[in-house]
């Protein structure tokens, strides 16, 4: 059985949010005082794995784990390891991750060891003052260290930037030059 959308296109890519929680409060994403889903309403890692198995059986070849911030999910590496093992016995080819980067320094090596070869990092500015303003209490230095640690572990990084008028639209060239210097 294959998944086909209303335009008769084959669906082979699944994005799955593993948590609604995040360690940042980016202005355009979360309120400072968020109300999160009760834990009993969040899928367990086993349920997420079963869901992924069903989609893999229907032709999904790529799974992207997202959140909130997926790296704050307890035992996320165990899920990634289980999904990675499916690459050898199913049609699954790739597991990727979208993250704010705040925990990458801690997890980069484990992510690589468990089959993550590409990560999207949400980063709207490299100006520390603006970063603190947009994230409320984020630390740009941790994110940069995490990006560098990921690169050191041969993980490809893609930077996702939300361009906002009167905030960061004049920083795009600097951000591009910065990423080029990282050899992303």
Regions found by a protein language model. Name each.
Residues 18, 70, 163:
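Hydrophobic adenine-recognition pocket in adenosine-nucleotide-binding enzymes
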Residues 1-13, 177, 181:
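Auxiliary Fe-S-binding modules of radical SAM enzymes
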Residues 36, 67-70:
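Glycine-rich, proline-tolerant flexible connector loops at the mouths of alpha/beta enzymes
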Residues 184:
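Histidine- and aromatic-rich ligand-binding microenvironments
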Residues 45, 49-64, 73-177:
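Radical SAM/AdoMet-radical enzyme domain recognition
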Residues 6-46:
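Canonical Radical SAM [4Fe-4S] cluster-binding loop centered on the CxxxCxxC motif
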Residues 2, 38, 126-129:
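Residue-level signal for pocket-adjacent positions within structured domains
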């Amino acid at each position: 059985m294959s998944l086909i959308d209303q335009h008769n296109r084959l669906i082979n890519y699944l994005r799955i949010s593993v948590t609604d929680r995040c360690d940042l409060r980016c202005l355009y994403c979360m309120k400072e005082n968020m109300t999160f889903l009760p834990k009993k309403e969040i899928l367990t890692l086993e349920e997420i794995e079963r869901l992924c198995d069903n989609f893999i059986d229907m032709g999904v070849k790529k799974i992207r784990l997202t959140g909130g911030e997926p790296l704050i999910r307890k035992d996320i590496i165990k899920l990634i390891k289980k999904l990675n093992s499916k690459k050898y016995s199913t049609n699954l080819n790739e597991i990727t991750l979208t993250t704010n980067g705040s925990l990458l320094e801690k997890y980069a090596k484990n992510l690589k060891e468990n089959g993550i070869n590409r990560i999207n990092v949400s980063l709207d500015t490299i100006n520390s003052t603006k970063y603190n303003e947009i994230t409320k209490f984020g630390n740009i230095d941790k994110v940069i260290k995490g990006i560098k640690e990921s690169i050191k572990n041969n993980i490809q990084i893609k930077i996702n930037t939300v361009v906002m008028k009167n905030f960061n639209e004049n920083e795009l060239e600097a951000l591009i030059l910065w990423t080029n210097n990282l050899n992303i």
